[in-house]
Amino acid sequence: MRIVVLGKELEYDFFDADLLEKYEKENLRVKERIQEPTQYDGKTTADSLRIQCGIVNDFFDEVFGKGMSEELFGGKNNIKDHMEAFAAVADAAMNCNGELTALTEKYSPNRAERRQAEKQNSKNFNRNAAYHGN
């Protein structure tokens, strides 16, 4: 899937189990690290933003490959850019999750059984209609 992040087009396959696992692991890691309160003790707001930007940098380097954060952010610690970039990837993952759910429902055994039953009922209806002169 193509994801546009800060004007740069990235590619990631959320349907590949190994890549999805890496994304999910790093996404959870971002959440845990950002919510760790002790790292902000005694820090200025600017230092806190640098910490958060560093966490997002680590995410991009782990998920998309070493150096991706530098490519995207150019060494800057702009929290707005970092959060928008992270959100773009999260949105893409959620869209793929919706597609995956639709795919699994479409091809689930229960649905296949229902379709077969509907098909059989349709055949029976058509036979009955022909027999009764309808």
Q: PLM ranges: what are they?
A:
Residues 52-57:
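Short amphipathic alpha-helical coiled-coil/interface segments
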Residues 2, 29, 33, 50, ...:
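Arginine residue identity/basic-tract feature
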Residues 1-46:
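Short N-terminal mixed-charge amphipathic segments
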Residues 38-47, 71-79:
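Short, surface-exposed loop/turn segments at secondary-structure junctions
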Residues 70-134:
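C-terminal charged interaction modules
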Residues 65-66:
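Short acidic, glycine/tyrosine-flanked loop/strand segments centered on an H-E-D-like triad
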